[in-house]
Amino acid sequence: MTMGNTQNWRLEGDYFEGCNCDSICPCIFLQDPDKGHCNVVVGWHIEKGHYDSIQLEGLNVVAVFVAPGNMFTGPKMKAAFYIDKRSSEEQVNALSKIFSGQSGGFFAAAANLIGEALGIKTAPITFEMKGRRRRLRIPEFMELEIEAIKGNNTDIDSLVTNPSFTVAPGYDPIIARSSKNTYRDLGFEWDSSGKNGFYSKFKYGP
């Protein structure tokens, strides 16, 4: 089934990410990654969402970005997306339109940073939140676990305020560190455990 693009869509929920940079990742200030490259895994859990009349609540999406250098000045990134296997065909098509940037909004701007799209596939995605911990898993492909870094006052989240770029515009990312960050698919393989992580709420629209 195919569908046209629409400007009538909204997504909101929770997101988190992990990469191979040390905390904190300099990429959010448009700087070069501290290892010369940045491999990023990003997960979203949609609490509320729709694409026209197609409801998207409760679904998960994962993106993998491989940046061989500064992701803003080039060379451009490679990107792959995984959509929740529980999604119907209509939901897969809707989420593909949104996350590929075809329906405008944040992802349309982010698409300018991508030089090669490695595809979109469905997969069973586990997205878990417990306090200041987050866990993301796709069997056989990837696993990411992060926990917020504690500051002097452990009752307050440690934030990056006023970043130049964030996956969730309008929200200051909470600084975290991964206890596990492994990936193996599409010819890539890495273990970036013990490195940078961020998480926050998100809200997107056209």
Annotate each predicted stretch with a short phrase.
Residues I149-P206:
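Extended, charged low-complexity segments
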Residues G4-Y51:
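N-terminal ordered "arm"
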Residues L30-H37, N70-P75, L118-R137, I174-S178:
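Short, surface-exposed loop and linker segments with low hydrophobicity and enrichment for Pro/Ser/Thr
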Residues G36-F107:
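Aromatic- and glycine-enriched beta-alpha-beta binding-site module
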Residues M77-L159:
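Charged linear interaction tracts used for macromolecular binding and regulation
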Residues S53-N60, F81, G115-K121, P163-S164, ...:
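Low-complexity, flexible helical/coil segments
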Residues C19, I24-F29, K35, D52-I54, ...:
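Residues in flexible loops and secondary-structure boundaries
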Residues M1-N8, Y204-P206:
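Basic/polar N-terminal segments that are highly enriched at the extreme N-terminus
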